């Protein structure tokens, strides 16, 4: 997944260990969805919301704020699904308000289902 933040400074070489702590400063990364939305003509724009609380509320807010056609809401607070797992359980929400919840399945199956649901609309 693309991160919202990136390291402000980076080195092309190994950073040697010193006796001091190392502090990283992060800055906002570019908004890829905004860039794609600004170029959009007839494409269907799908975003992803990885959330640890208020899953549907936060996902719907992002759907509206970013003017997406669909958003795939992913609850990352569960250890058996999400980032640290090979399986996932998501809810696909359309801009018209339709919701399709997918049961826990492999991430490959989730991707296929997302594609099939959007293709079928």
Outline where the language-model segments fall.
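Small-residue (G/A/S/T)-rich helix-start motifs and N-terminal tracts that mark the onset
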Residues: 68, 75, 80-121
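Glycine-rich phosphate/dinucleotide-binding loop and adjoining beta-alpha-beta core of small-molecule
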Residues: 1-79
């Amino acid at each position: 997944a693309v991160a919202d933040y990136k390291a402000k400074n980076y080195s092309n070489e190994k950073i040697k260990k010193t006796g001091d702590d190392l502090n990283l400063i992060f800055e906002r990364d570019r908004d890829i969805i905004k860039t794609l939305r600004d170029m959009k003509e007839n494409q269907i724009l799908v975003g992803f919301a990885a959330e640890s609380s208020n899953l549907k509320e936060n996902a719907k807010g992002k759907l509206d704020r970013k003017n997406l056609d669909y958003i795939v809401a992913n609850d990352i607070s569960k250890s058996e699904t999400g980032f640290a797992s090979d399986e996932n359980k998501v809810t696909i929400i359309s801009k018209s308000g339709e919701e399709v919840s997918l049961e826990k399945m492999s991430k490959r199956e989730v991707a296929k289902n997302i594609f099939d649901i959007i293709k079928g609309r």
